[in-house]
C-alpha cells in the first residue's frame, strides 16, 4: 500500500508541477445568452483576469439593441453554489463605452483594474483547482427595471486533468499488455497468455466505456468529468495529427461535403462544457430551467462533437480520424507479424537460430495472422460501430458515408461469423466428445483463428462473447443514432449496463475467479458512470450543484480505478518477463482446456534418428504390457505368497474368473515409497554388475548354443527401426528378457567365470532379474520374478 501511495504522489506531482508554475489567471472565451430574445449577444468574447495586478483585459465584439442606461446584476457560481452577488451601475464604474448603450456593434479592446475588495471576494482555491466549474451570470436592466438581456460567461484557470502524459501512459501500458499476451501465445504459454489477454481486453473495454459514456449528448457535463474522459479518447481513435486534418478536410470537400473550420475561425465562439443547443420552434420554457442559447456566432457543442472539439478535431474530420487510425494500426499489426515470421526464417537459414525454434509459429503463422486481425477488429468494434452510425446522421460527405457502410459490414459481419464458428465448433465438440473444450482448444486452427472469441471465458461459457458484442452493439446504436436526445441516451444506456451487470454476476463467465472479480468491478464502475450521466442529462431536474459534485465523484472514482488496473497489468507483465515458467505464476482455468491443448514440439529433423528408433522401440515394448503393469507387480507378490504349490501367478491368472476379478481390483493400488526405493536400488545395482562384467572380459564373447526350451518362437514378434533381429516371446510376457538371446551372443563361460562354483552361482540365481543388465546371465526360467522381495538382493 505504501508503494501505491508513493507512486500516486509522484504521478500527481509530475502532472501538477508544470502547471503550478504558471501565473494565476482566470480566462473566459465564450459568452452565451441565458434568456430568449436577449438584446445583447456576443460575436467574439475574450476576457482574462490576473489577481496579482488586479488587471482585467477584455476584447469584445458585441451586438445590442439596447438604447438606455443599464444596471447589471452579477451572480458568481462555483460548482452550482452562488458565492458572490453584486448590483452596480455601469456608469458609476467609469466604463464610458457602456454609459449609455446605443444600438449597434460594440467593439472594445481595453484593460480595467478591479478594486481590491472585489479581488478578495474570489477564493484562492479558484486559481489552483483543475477544471474549475465557475461561471458568471449578468442580468441587465434599464432604469425602469425591465430585463433587457441575460448573458453567461464560463471561466477557466488554465489547469486541467487532461494531460498528454496520462494519455500516453494509459495507451502504452495497455499496448504492453496486448503485446505480452501475443508473445506468450507464440511461445505456447497458454495459461499466462489467457490471463493477461483477458485482463488487458477488459482494460481496453473499460477505457472505451468511459469514452462512450462521455459521448452522450447530455445537458451539462461538469468540466472535470469531461476533461478526464479526454484522456481516454485515444481508445476511440480520436488522435489529432495536424497534417492528417488537412488531408481529411480535402477528402470531405473532394467527395461532395463541406468541411467545417470551427478551430480556425476568428469570429466564432464555441462552448463545449455545458448547455442546451438552441431549440427552434420552441417558445415556452419553465421559469427555473437553465437554458442557454447559441447564435450564428456562438455554437454549443455537446456529445461526440464536444469530445472532438476538445481533442482539436473538426466535426467533419471526427469519423475520418477514427477510421484512419484503425486502418493504420491494423496494417502495422499485420506487417509486424509478417516481419517476425520472415525474420525468423532468415535467421534459421543463416544459421543464427536452431531450426526447431518457433516451429509452431512458423507452421501456423497464417492462422495466427488471421486470429490477430480478428482480435484487433474485436478491440475496435465499439469505435467502428459508433462512428459509422453517427456518420449516417451527420452525412459529412458521400465518400465518408460509403466508408462507414463498409466498416459496419466488416465489423458486424466478422464478429457474427466468429460467434457462429465458435458456437458451431463447440456444439460439434459436445456432440462428439461431450465437452466443448475438445475442439475449441484441441484444434490448433480453431484456437489460433477464433481463440480471441472464447479464451477469456470458461469453456462452459464459450458463447459469452456473442452476448458481449451484442451488448456493445446495442449501446453503439443509442450513442450513434440518438445524439438529438441526451435523456434518451442516458436512460437507455443505464438500463443496458444494469442488465449486463446482473448477467455477469449471475453467470461469472470468465476463466477464473480473480478475472471474474476484476470484470465485475469494471461493470460496477461502468454502471455507476451511466448512473451519474443520468444526472448530467438533467433527467431528474435537480440543481446543478448535484451534477457538479457528481462530476468530482466521476473523476476520483475513474482515476483511482484506472490506476489500479494499469498497475495490475504492469505487475502481470513484470512477473511474466522475470519468470522462467510464466504458466506457474497463474492458476489454471477452472476447466480442462489444458488437457486438450497441444504444446510446442521440436521439428522432425531436429531429432536424432537413433534416438527416434530407441523411442519407437520403447513404445512398442510398452504396448506388450497391460495397463498399470508396474502396479501389478505388488499384486503378483501377494498372490504368490498365498500359492502353496509354488505355481507362478502369470499361469494362474488365466485360470478362473474370480482370480481375474481380484487382479483387476488390485490394479488401482500403488506401490509404497519404500517399495519404489527398493526397486530403483535394485536396478542401479544390476547396472553396476553389468558394467563390471563387461570391463572384465570385453573380447571373450563368442557364440553359444541356446537351450531349446528357452528359445521358443513367438508368434507376435515385432520389428524395430534399426534392429535386424526378431524378438521372441518371453516367459514373463514383458518383452524384455529373451529377445537378446537371438542376437547370437556366445559367452565363453570358462574364460569368464573363475570356477564351477562361481559359474553355478551365477547361472542359478535364487530370483529372476527383470532388468536389462541381466542379458549376459543365464537364468532359471522356473523361478518367480520378484524384485520387491526383501531377500532379492
Swiss-Prot record:
Query: TM segments?
Result: 164-184, 195-215, 224-244, 250-272, 318-338, 373-393, 398-418, 462-482, 485-505, 517-537, 552-572
Mapped to this chain, the residue ranges on the Cytoplasmic side of the membrane are 185-194, 245-249, 339-372, 419-461, 506-516, 573-793
Q: Where is the composition biased (Polar residues)?
A: 701-719
User: Does the entry feature the keyword Endoplasmic reticulum, yes or no?
Assistant: yes
Q: Does the keyword Transmembrane apply?
A: yes
> What are the entry keywords?
Endoplasmic reticulum, Glycoprotein, Membrane, Phosphoprotein, Signal, Transmembrane, Transmembrane helix, Transport
Q: Which parts of the chain does the record assign to the membrane side Lumenal?
A: 22-163, 216-223, 273-317, 394-397, 483-484, 538-551
Q: Topology versus the membrane, per the UniProt entry? A: Multi-pass membrane protein
Q: Which residues bear sugar attachments?
A: 143, 281
Q: What does this protein do?
A: May be responsible for the transport of FAD into the endoplasmic reticulum lumen, where it is required for oxidative protein folding.
Would you tell me the protein name for this molecule?
Flavin carrier protein 1
Which species is listed as the source?
Answer: Saccharomyces cerevisiae (strain ATCC 204508 / S288c)
Q: Its gene? A: FLC1
Amino acid at each position: 500500500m505504501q508503494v501505491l501511495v508513493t507512486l500516486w504522489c509522484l504521478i500527481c506531482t509530475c502532472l501538477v508541477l508544470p502547471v503550478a508554475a504558471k501565473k494565476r489567471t482566470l480566462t473566459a472565451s465564450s459568452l452565451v445568452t441565458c434568456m430568449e430574445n436577449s438584446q445583447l449577444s456576443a460575436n467574439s468574447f475574450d476576457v482574462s483576469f490576473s489577481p496579482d495586478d488586479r488587471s482585467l483585459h477584455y476584447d469584445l465584439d458585441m451586438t445590442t439593441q439596447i438604447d438606455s442606461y443599464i444596471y447589471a446584476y452579477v451572480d458568481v457560481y462555483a460548482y452550482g453554489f452562488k458565492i458572490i452577488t453584486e448590483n452596480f451601475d455601469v456608469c458609476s464604474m467609469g466604463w464610458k463605452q457602456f454609459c449609455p448603450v446605443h444600438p449597434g456593434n460594440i467593439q472594445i479592446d481595453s484593460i480595467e483594474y478591479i478594486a481590491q475588495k472585489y479581488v478578495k471576494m474570489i477564493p484562492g482555491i479558484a486559481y489552483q483547482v483543475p477544471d474549475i466549474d465557475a461561471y458568471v451570470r449578468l442580468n441587465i436592466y434599464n432604469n425602469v427595471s425591465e430585463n433587457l438581456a441575460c448573458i453567461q460567461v464560463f471561466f477557466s484557470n488554465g489547469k486541467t486533468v487532461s494531460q498528454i502524459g496520462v494519455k500516453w501512459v494509459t495507451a502504452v501500458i495497455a499496448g504492453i499488455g496486448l503485446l505480452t499476451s501475443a508473445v506468450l501465445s507464440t511461445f505456447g504459454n497458454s495459461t499466462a497468455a489467457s490471463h493477461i489477454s483477458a485482463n488487458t481486453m477488459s482494460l481496453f473495454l473499460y477505457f472505451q466505456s468511459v469514452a462512450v459514456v462521455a459521448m452522450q449528448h447530455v445537458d451539462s457535463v461538469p468540466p472535470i468529468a469531461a476533461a478526464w474522459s479526454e484522456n481516454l479518447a485515444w481508445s476511440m481513435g480520436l488522435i489529432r495529427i495536424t497534417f492528417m486534418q488537412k488531408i481529411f478536410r480535402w477528402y470531405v470537400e473532394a467527395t461532395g461535403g463541406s468541411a467545417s473550420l470551427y478551430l480556425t475561425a476568428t469570429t466564432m465562439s464555441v462552448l463545449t462544457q455545458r448547455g442546451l443547443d438552441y431549440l427552434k420552434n420552441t417558445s415556452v420554457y419553465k421559469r427555473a430551467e437553465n437554458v442557454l442559447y447559441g447564435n450564428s456566432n456562438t455554437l454549443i457543442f455537446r456529445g461526440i462533437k464536444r469530445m472532438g472539439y476538445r481533442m482539436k478535431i473538426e466535426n467533419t474530420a471526427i469519423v475520418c480520424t477514427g477510421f484512419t487510425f484503425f486502418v493504420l494500426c491494423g496494417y502495422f499489426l499485420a506487417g509486424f507479424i509478417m516481419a517476425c515470421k520472415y525474420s525468423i526464417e532468415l535467421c534459421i537459414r543463416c544459421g543464427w537460430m536452431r531450426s526447431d525454434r518457433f516451429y509452431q509459429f512458423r507452421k501456423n503463422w497464417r492462422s495466427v495472422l488471421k486470429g490477430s486481425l480478428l482480435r484487433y477488429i474485436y478491440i475496435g468494434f465499439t469505435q467502428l460501430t459508433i462512428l459509422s452510425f453517427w456518420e449516417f446522421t451527420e452525412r459529412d460527405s458521400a465518400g465518408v458515408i460509403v466508408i462507414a457502410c463498409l466498416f459496419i459490414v466488416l465489423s458486424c459481419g466478422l464478429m457474427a461469423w466468429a460467434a457462429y464458428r465458435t458456437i458451431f465448433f463447440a456444439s460439434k465438440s459436445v456432440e462428439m466428445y461431450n465437452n466443448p473444450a475438445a475442439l475449441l482448444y484441441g484444434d490448433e486452427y480453431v484456437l489460433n483463428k477464433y481463440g480471441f472469441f472464447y479464451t477469456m471465458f470458461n469453456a462452459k461459457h464459450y458463447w459469452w462473447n456473442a452476448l458481449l458484442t451484442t451488448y456493445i452493439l446495442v449501446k453503439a446504436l443509442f450513442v450513434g443514432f440518438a445524439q438529438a436526445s441526451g435523456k434518451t441516451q442516458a436512460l437507455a444506456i443505464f438500463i443496458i449496463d444494469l442488465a449486463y451487470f446482473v448477467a455477469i454476476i449471475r453467470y461469472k463467465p470468465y476463466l477464473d475467479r480473480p478475472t471474474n472479480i476484476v470484470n465485475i468491478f469494471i461493470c460496477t464502475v461502468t454502471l455507476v458512470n451511466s448512473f451519474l450521466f443520468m444526472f448530467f442529462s438533467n433527467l431528474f431536474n435537480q440543481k446543478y450543484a448535484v451534477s457538479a459534485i457528481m462530476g468530482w465523484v466521476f473523476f476520483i472514482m475513474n482515476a483511482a480505478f484506472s490506476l489500479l488496473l494499469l498497475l495490475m497489468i504492469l505487475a502481470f507483465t513484470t512477473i511474466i518477463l522475470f519468470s522462467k515458467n510464466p504458466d506457474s505464476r497463474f492458476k489454471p482455468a477452472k476447466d480442462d482446456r489444458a488437457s486438450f491443448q497441444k504444446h510446442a514440439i521440436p521439428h522432425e529433423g531436429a531429432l536424432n534418428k537413433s534416438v527416434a528408433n530407441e523411442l519407437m522401440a520403447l513404445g512398442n515394448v510398452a504396448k506388450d504390457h497391460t495397463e498399470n503393469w508396474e502396479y501389478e507387480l505388488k499384486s503378483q507378490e501377494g498372490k504368490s505368497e498365498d500359492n502353496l504349490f509354488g505355481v507362478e501367478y502369470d499361469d494362474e491368472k488365466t485360470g478362473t474368473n474370480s482370480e481375474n476379478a481380484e487382479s483387476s481390483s488390485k490394479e488401482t493400488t500403488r506401490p509404497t515409497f519404500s517399495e519404489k526405493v527398493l526397486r530403483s536400488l535394485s536396478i542401479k545395482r544390476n547396472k553396476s554388475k553389468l558394467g563390471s562384467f563387461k570391463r572384465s572380459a570385453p573380447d571373450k564373447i563368442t557364440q553359444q548354443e541356446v537351450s531349446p526350451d528357452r528359445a521358443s518362437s513367438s508368434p507376435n514378434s515385432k520389428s524395430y527401426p534399426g534392429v535386424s533381429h526378431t524378438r521372441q516371446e518371453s516367459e514373463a510376457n514383458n518383452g524384455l528378457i529373451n529377445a537378446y538371446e537371438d542376437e547370437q551372443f556366445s559367452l565363453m563361460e570358462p574364460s569368464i567365470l573363475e570356477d564351477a562354483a562361481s559359474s553355478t552361482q551365477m547361472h542359478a540365481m535364487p530370483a529372476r532379474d527383470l532388468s536389462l543388465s541381466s542379458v549376459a546371465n543365464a537364468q532359471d526360467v522356473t523361478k518367480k520374478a520378484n524384485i520387491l522381495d526383501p531377500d532379492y538382493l
